[in-house]
Design a protein with these regions (language model features):
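Short pre-catalytic strand/loop immediately N-terminal to key active-site residues, enriched for Gly-Thr
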Residues: 28-38, 234
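Positively charged, low-complexity intrinsically disordered leader regions
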Residues: 1-26
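Hydrophobic beta-strand scaffold residues
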Residues: 55, 81, 165-167, 197
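Conserved N-terminal subdomain of the carbohydrate kinase-like
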Residues: 54-139
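Alpha-helix C-terminal capping segments
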Residues: 43-54, 99
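N-terminal glycine-rich anion-binding loops that anchor highly charged ligand groups
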Residues: 16-20, 39-46
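A short helix->loop->beta-strand "cap" motif at the edges of active sites that frequently abuts
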Residues: 157-164
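Conserved phosphate/ATP/ADP-binding segment of small-molecule kinases
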Residues: 175-237
Length: 237
């Protein structure tokens, strides 16, 4: 029986998301943006709190006003931010999004020197993962060090302490030096995961064999077109 004190801790991306105010306008003609928060681990933590769960976020922000914006939002939503440290010398990440219905949603990531990519093994230890029932990990958090090792370490700690591990595939094509590296990394951790969550494209991305399988139109980084057989991809992973 799991006697852990808290419901869920989510680990990974956190950002300010700036959405176009001008629905239908080409990106270069946008006149203004509305500020929201983003990063699927952050959003999932917020959603869990709104459903009445006890949720924490394991991420990081920079020593900047954007980080203050995120912490304030999360605190107001009831998310435990004890494990969202400020990483000096880094920047809280940002995303800018256009909205051109029905099928054009360009997206630009600003993640150079991103704070949440600097979460390390020491941060994981301080998060006391054995105190939770569920750990949610994130694909993008495994694209570079030190968060890659921190994610694998967090997963090991969770499994040793009867904490269920959920993987949000979260394939963001331009965050990987090689599209195939996403699949190699995800497949390495999948055997330790209780539940994996992803779109059809993300499942296909996990089994990419050739970079030519991926096509990105109109800078839609969150919605690439990926060639492949979805049923075969599911069997492979």
């Amino acid at each position: 029986m799991n006697t852990n004190k808290h419901d869920i801790i989510t680990f990974g991306r956190s950002s300010i998301d700036l959405y176009s105010q001008n629905i239908g306008a080409p990106f270069n003609l946008i006149k203004g943006f509305d500020a929201f928060v983003g990063g699927s681990p952050l959003n999932i933590a917020v959603g869990c709190c709104r459903l009445g769960l006890d949720a924490s976020l394991l991420s990081a922000v920079g020593e900047d006003k954007v980080g203050e914006f995120l912490i304030n939002f999360l605190t107001e939503e009831g998310v435990n931010v004890t494990n969202v440290p400020t990483k000096k010398g880094t920047r809280t990440s940002a995303v800018i999004l256009g909205i051109e219905p029905p099928d054009k949603f360009p997206l630009v990531f600003y993640r150079d020197n991103a704070s949440d990519s600097q979460v390390d093994i020491d941060d994981v230890d301080r998060a006391n993962i054995p105190d939770y029932k569920v750990l949610l990990i994130n694909g993008t958090a495994m694209n570079i060090e030190p968060t890659r090792s921190a994610t694998f370490y967090a997963t090991e700690v969770a499994l040793k302490n009867n904490v269920k591990v959920v993987l949000d595939l979260d394939f963001r094509a331009d965050q990987w030096h090689d599209y195939r590296a996403f699949g190699v990394t995800v497949r390495a951790i999948l055997p330790q995961v209780k539940i994996a969550i992803g779109t059809e494209e993300e499942i296909l991305a996990a089994t990419i064999e050739n970079v030519s399988q991926v096509e990105i139109k109109d800078q839609q980084m969150s919605a690439p077109e990926i060639k492949g057989d979805i049923d075969l991809a599911i069997k492979k992973i």
